[in-house]
């Protein structure tokens, strides 16, 4: 079974894909076309995904919009479109966009300050100060990516799963963080 989890940042996709891979006894190929992958690595990863029988991978709209660097042909896009046609497609969304934005801001700022990684947990409370303009930039990015997700899913048969319906308190990251938005 090929399975694509199409979502946006901070929607529980890491846990969801890990669980799905265990449940279906398949390989978890994670963010196989991540924006930090080189073009050649994306081609290699897409080719691997399409030739692997039992695999799950997650993709965000930002990954899709960055498939092809300027000057390259549509090799990655053609393979990706073929993968979408051959895969079960699950869309993961959040009902609470404000919580999604806050989670994204916290993850970005914790990573930039080297206080914690994208998926790290910790017990001691951390206070983060975020300039209003930076917060708005991140909020606009998440909002735009959610809109892009809506455009993409119109073209494919899919199942929608909501983060709030599967992410119990035990599954959520333990991150006691106070976020202060400053002018």
PLM regions and their residue ranges:
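PAPS-dependent sulfotransferase catalytic core
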Residues: 1-54, 59
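PAPS-dependent sulfotransferase catalytic domain
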Residues: 61-159, 163-181
């Amino acid at each position: 079974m090929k399975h694509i989890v199409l979502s946006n940042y901070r929607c529980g996709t890491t846990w969801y894909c890990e669980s799905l891979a265990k449940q279906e006894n398949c390989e978890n190929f994670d963010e196989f076309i991540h924006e930090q992958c080189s073009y050649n690595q994306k081609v290699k990863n897409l080719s691997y995904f399409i030739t692997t029988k039992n695999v799950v991978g997650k993709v965000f709209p930002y990954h899709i919009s960055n498939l092809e660097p300027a000057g390259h042909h549509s090799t990655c896009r053609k393979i990706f479109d073929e993968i979408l046609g051959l895969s079960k497609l699950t869309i993961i969304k959040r009902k609470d966009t404000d919580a999604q934005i806050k989670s994204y801001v916290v993850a970005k700022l914790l990573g930039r300050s080297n206080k914690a990684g994208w998926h790290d947990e910790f017990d001691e409370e951390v206070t983060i100060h975020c300039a209003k303009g930076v917060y708005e930039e991140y909020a606009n990015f998440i909002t735009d990516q959610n809109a892009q997700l809506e455009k993409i899913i119109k073209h494919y048969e899919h199942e929608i799963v909501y983060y709030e319906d599967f992410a119990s308190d035990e599954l959520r990251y333990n991150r006691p963080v106070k976020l202060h938005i400053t002018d």
